[in-house]
Amino acid sequence: MAYAYGQCTWGVAARMNQLGLKLKGRNGEKISIINTMGNGQDWVATASSLGGETGSTPRAGAIVSFVGGTHGTPAIYGHVAFVEKVYDDGSFLVSETNYGGNPNYTFRKISQADSAISFAYTCLLYTSDA
């Protein structure tokens, strides 16, 4: 993996790899993340440019990008995290690395999506008929 260990981009790429996920294309195709997805705030825009399905609603398994300078993120780079769970009230739990400079995986509950947050949706790399 070409992302620097402990950076937010590394954390999301590693989590997707661990779960066997790809980006979900607008037509249902599976799209690999690339080594040049950009800074955290760029991931959803890059996913869209690759044909990925994106939106403003959290879904479990989605990539979430935060605009730089919002939600406690660096102004220049923004942040990217992985949506682990969505709650009935619209809040969602993310796993992430390098939030607040911590290179380890941490979890954080986001109260709701807003205009500084966007999502790229994922799908399983392999499916079973069993």
Where are these regions (language model features)?
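Secreted/periplasmic proteins that engage bacterial cell-wall peptidoglycan
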Residues: 1-85, 95-96
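Intrinsically disordered, low-complexity, charged/polar segments
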Residues: 106-125
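Short solvent-exposed strand/turn elements
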Residues: 91-111
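Conserved small/polar residues in nucleotide/adenosyl-binding loops
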Residues: 126-130
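A broad, low-specificity signal marking well-ordered, structured residues that form hydrophobic/aromatic
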Residues: 81, 92, 117
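Short, conserved beta-turn/loop elements at beta-strand boundaries and strand-helix junctions
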Residues: 86-90
